[in-house]
């Protein structure tokens, strides 16, 4: 590698974005250059270009070459620093990867975003404070009595709220991750309401947020609504009205609306939503058809990303839920026994015969609700 004193402004900005795990007011974290280099190496392996990268970087490659696929690799392998790997090495790898596959950078962007969200959630597991009695003790009125003595009820209320907080954080991180990586994978990008690529029919001065905006080679603009599922909860009636009007707003703005729902579970809301899209010349894809559409639009390289990093994990976990007697509204899941233990700073979570240890270092600033990290 040629010795260099500084990166170009463009490369510096690109590297900063890739290395930044989180930069919220409550939490800041960066990757080391060696950690990013290992993610880049994983991309090369995934797309079948590991031999080319090994030849291009004979000294560097043995230090960063993964021995297993991403989900089978412990986070410690990524975070174990190697100071001999520099930012200039990373830039050289980016240049080499880009020359090997036109979708290399898109694949890297998506995998890096997934990795950073997982790393951030790992920090949340370590730092999320246990709830205080001020927060949970009023809830004792629902269960105070003979079943749990006060000391047991105090623990039950605390564990329950703690797990709720962790689940809420997980849902936040998944939400911030899901739409951007799918949008990037199919060659589009998210658009904010301020950009007004889709305007509200009843007030054209206001825009609509678009999960994925993509313009076809023939100039046809597509406006995607990407959803994990469509729920039937009554509390979502107002939001559902917004979802129904999205298709009409797209059509009046000259864009073709496309609905993609990964969960195949049918309900009246989903049926109505599909009809709203099709009535204005749009399209709707649900379940297997949704996955197939995403992979068709993504092309071979990014389709493999969607399959490996999104579809397989979701399907693998979902497979343990069983539909009863062919009725999709009736489902069963045999839960493994749960045990939780907090000993000093060590949290142990056991499920059946499986165990996870988390070294805890609470950060009280994370006790506040919300931690918008939608950068």
Curated annotation (Swiss-Prot):
It comes from the Bacteria. One of its GO terms (molecular function) is type II site-specific deoxyribonuclease activity. The keyword Hydrolase applies. One of its GO terms (biological process) is DNA restriction-modification system. It catalyses: Endonucleolytic cleavage of DNA to give specific double-stranded fragments with terminal 5'-phosphates. Coiled coil: none annotated. Its EC number is 3.1.21.4. Keywords: Endonuclease, Hydrolase, Nuclease, Restriction system. The keyword Hydrolase applies. This is Type II restriction enzyme ApaLI. It comes from Acetobacter pasteurianus. The gene is apaLIR.
